[in-house]
Amino acid sequence: MVRLATFNDNVQVVHIGHLFRNSGHKEWRIFVWFNPMQERKWTRFTHLPLLSRAKVVNSTTKQINKADRVIEFEASDLQRAKIIDFPNLSSFASVRNKDGAQSSFIYEAETPYSKTRYHIPQLELARSLFLINSYFCRSCLSSTALQQEFDVQYEVERDHLEIRILPSSSFPKGALEQSAVVQLLVWLFSDQDVMDSYESIFRHYQQNREIKNGVESWCFSFDPPPMQGWKLHVKGRSSNEDKDYLVEEIVGLEINAMLPSTTAISHASFQEKEAGDGSTQHIAVSTESVVDDEHLQLDDEETANIDTDTRVIEAEPTWISFSRPSRIEKSRRARKSSQTILEKEEATTSENSNLVSTDEPHLGGVLAAADVGGKQDATNYNSIFANRFAAFDELLSILKTKFACRVLFEETLVLPKVGRSRLHLCKDGSPRVIKAVGVQRNGSEFVLLEVDASDGVKMLSTKVLSGVDSETWRNDFEKIRRGVVKSSLNWPNSLFDQLYGQDGHRGVNHPKGLGELQVSREDMEGWAERVVREQFTH
């Protein structure tokens, strides 16, 4: 887990406050207080993706990021308020005064039996929607960043979006391997209400900033997008009387949005070699040595060097899902074989090689550039990637017709990016996905897992799970998806042992010829028989 270099291990956030910067300086910082108290009371604003109230920063143990409430928005009626409106905010006057001054929204949810006032810090809502990585933390406080760095065109007839990332853009190309970040880009550029919400951050800053004694400061606020039909999965705490609830962290978002049917994204790095005569000249360019993400530290002072690729660091990102995602295509431009290619080579390891900077990269910067944050993609891609599971879907059909099975749920999710591995992508650069299907037979329930092998890289057996708890399945499935990538596209059997016991999971071999889709009906039925047999041997 990446660390904030300035602070001690296992410190808990107790207050997130105003943004500030010295007059004439470009970089923004944000006040943050911890328990135990730390000498420094601020960090870079570009570190915001790591910060939420009550979160333990620089944790030496794995944190479980599980929601304890789900807020369903039947309407978008949010009242502007301050966090002090939440009763029992803090027993410490200093925290109560500073945290209480921060902006919030209040949403009232009513059931036949109770009424709850949800207090949602405005910065936390914006962090979950827009400020998902260091790049967006910088660009939101500029009126021109997106217009200068992206060229976007929408074709109404085809319901098709074109996003061209311009050569001058500082958007980290590694973030384009995070499928949820790409879907968020599509959402932002295709929905004017969403773009208006994002741009309102800069408008609120201009209207409400203060300058005193050479320091510019601002209490964060913005206009939220319409949220009707959304679900927020949150962690927080209730007031003593249980009538109010303070959202400390938004763990996940279910967004009711119809994204364009297809989106093409182009970036200067998306290149394919063009066949032809001529030679290619490779020139080595020095970069920082490779250090695992968990050993990296984010520096609060030093600048970032533009000569190194911006390293994208996922740090326990929260998740998001869209009701109708977009099918993403990467537009690749051919390059001639005689073209000169700049290749990054690792520099000699230095004692500061584990320090990185989320400052905007520029010439003369001291440290390697980094971008921290991201989003886990919890979108169900059943319809978009259905063709990758044609044989598996035929298996399900046989289970239903011949073995009286009932399908309880189907979901197709992308495999996440883990470390520097690229196995979460297929050969063509599209997301690799995994399908989970809940099945019931004779009163018993089990889950089938099938990994996308459409590019022929590797074909895993069908996994049969029993003893799955619907309450923990979302978290279990996230661990399983990461485990598949960490295990180099193998089943993470030690993880399955932990989750369901050694007898709670079985592998079922595919019929021969499945990769070429040349399987007889008899062999398909044999596959289904093995699935049923394994389920009943648990």
Curated annotation (Swiss-Prot):
Say which domain of life the source belongs to: Bacteria
- Region (Disordered) residue ranges read 330-360
* UniProt-listed Pfam families: TnsE_C (PF18623)
**Alphabetically ordered keywords of this record:** DNA recombination, DNA-binding, Plasmid, Transposable element, Transposition
Keyword DNA-binding in the entry? The reply is yes
Q: Which InterPro entries match?
A: TnsE_C, Transposition_TnsE
Q: Which residues bind DNA?
A: 311-330
Q: What is a biological process (GO) this protein takes part in?
A: transposition
User: Is DNA-binding there in the keyword field?
Assistant: yes
Q: Which GO terms describe its molecular function?
A: DNA binding
Please explain the role this protein plays, according to its UniProt record: TnsABC + TnsD promote high-frequency insertion of Tn7 into a specific target site known as att-Tn7 whereas TnsABC + TnsE promote low-frequency insertion into many different sites.
The name on file for this protein is Transposon Tn7 transposition protein TnsE
As recorded in Swiss-Prot or TrEMBL, the protein's gene is named: tnsE
